[in-house]
Amino acid sequence: MEFSQPDRLFSVWEYSVTHRTLLLRSDTYLSLEAGPRIEVSAGHVEIMFLRSTMRGLTIRKVSSADEVEALAERYGITEHLDFMFLLESANGQGLIVSGIPSWAVADCPVDAPSLFSRVGEVDRYPGAVMGRIE
C-alpha cells in the first residue's frame, strides 16, 4: 500500500538514535491552513536520506528488482534491500531503510502527544484512522 498526501507540508518531527525511530508530522496543508494531524512512524531505521521539510509526501515500498538495484547503487546501500521505502515530494526524493512504516490521522490539539507515543493514543480521538505502508 502507498501512502500519499500531496497537499500537505511534512517535517521531520523526531528521530531517536537509541530507539532508531523516525517520526514525520504534518499539521498544515501546503497553504499553511491548519488540518488534521498526520504522522508517519518508522522503526528500526537503518538508513535515511530525506529533507527536513517535504512539500507533499508519497511513501511507497520499493518493490521492483530494477528499482531496488538502481536505488541501492545510487545511495550506496548493500544490506536490508527488502526494506527500502521511497519518499517523494515536490521538493525532492528521499529514502529510508526501516521496518514497515505506520501512519495515523486524527483531529487533535497541536500540543497533543504523538499519535504513536503510547498504545491506544490514537483511540482518544473520534474518527482517527491508522494504517501501514506495505
Residues of each region from the PLM?
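Surface-exposed, interaction-prone regions used to assemble/regulate multi-protein complexes
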Residues: 1-134
